[in-house]
Amino acid sequence: MADSENAPLIWLIAGEPSGDLIGARLIAALRERTGGRLRIAGIGGEAMAAEGLESLFPISDIAVMGLVEIIPRIPLIKRRMRETIARIRQDRPDIVVSIDVPGFCYDVWKGLRSDDIPLVHYVAPTVWAWRPDRAKKFAAELDHLM
């Protein structure tokens, strides 16, 4: 996890396989750009683990789609949200970068809003016709959307 005691700490959240791959590429690019002077923490899968991330918990805990699949997992997902917020507050990263999974991350963003930690979301979420307010809702919680 740590390449240097005083190196910037970047906290990443990826909650499904495609986000894990994007996160792994992001870690590699950041490591190259900083000459390896970088610390990484967060939530990710096998690809991010290959880049040195020790995930707070398995992404399979939050990588759930479909109403029938989500309903029985709500208590676990809510617990993982609380654990994520608590760990980020404990770690005091220089930035939090969420990758995809806006449903999980939205509550994390809201929970961290008063903590003065920059929040960036990588991979802009789709704004559907039946949820046109989604972009405004996300913009209110984030510092930057890529």
Regions found by a protein language model. Name each.
Residues 8-146:
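Active-site and donor-binding regions of nucleotide-sugar-utilizing enzymes
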Residues 1-8:
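Extreme N-terminus of proteins, especially the signal/transit-peptide cleavage junction
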